[in-house]
């Protein structure tokens, strides 16, 4: 949906298509907040439309900060690291598994580099890796009142979820807690279904290859 369509659909949900109660500005604000809510609550696997890449980032001793790389990934969403030095995808490792990297069979090598994120810094092993491409999740672009004709950046399957959260916000502003809670529960239930499904389908192991 475009922002215009989302605004119109939200007006129908709120029983206010003429915008006599909820202004375009209030609905646009609610949509913007809701897009971020969806991005923050869903697994990265559903957010490929928000993926960006920055090429040829130089590392110092295998480390570079988000700010140094010129990126602002939403909730630390690094989805892949490509080792340009050795032409290999890094295996992404969660911080809870870092202790296991002390095992020589699991530590990063030039043929099997590993990467992890800690305190807004990207760490790559072996530290001889000098150049990487970083794939990350960016924030959705806010709509601006009076210029909402662009397509929503999120996957089309998530647009109704955005509207559920936006509807909940606006009913709450209108002092209708029951209707707000109903819309919010609909959104949370769908988030749970989607995340539970992804947990079943995603690869297992101490790390997964980027991309």
Question: Could you tell me what each predicted segment is?
Answer:
Residues 1-211:
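Glycine-enriched, solvent-exposed interface loops adjoining structured elements
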């Amino acid at each position: 949906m475009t922002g215009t369509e989302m605004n119109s659909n939200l007006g129908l949900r709120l029983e206010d298509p003429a915008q006599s109660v909820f202004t375009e500005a209030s609905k646009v604000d609610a949509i913007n907040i809701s897009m971020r809510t969806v991005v923050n609550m869903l697994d990265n696997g559903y957010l490929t439309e928000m993926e960006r890449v920055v090429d040829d980032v130089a590392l110092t001793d295998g480390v570079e900060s988000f700010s140094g790389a010129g990126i602002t990934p939403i909730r630390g969403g690094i989805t892949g690291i490509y080792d340009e030095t050795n032409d290999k995808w890094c295996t992404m490792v969660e911080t809870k598994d870092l202790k296991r990297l002390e095992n020589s069979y699991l530590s990063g090598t030039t043929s099997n580099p590993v990467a992890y994120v800690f305190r807004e810094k990207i760490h790559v092993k072996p530290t001889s890796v000098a150049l990487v491409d970083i794939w990350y999740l960016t924030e959705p672009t806010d709509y601006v009142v009076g210029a909402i004709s662009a397509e929503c950046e999120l996957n089309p399957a998530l647009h109704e979820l955005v509207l559920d959260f936006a509807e909940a916000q606006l009913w709450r502003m209108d002092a209708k807690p029951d209707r707000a809670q109903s819309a919010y529960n609909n959104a949370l239930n769908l988030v749970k279904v989607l995340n539970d499904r992804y947990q079943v389908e995603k690869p297992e192991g101490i790390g997964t290859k980027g991309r």
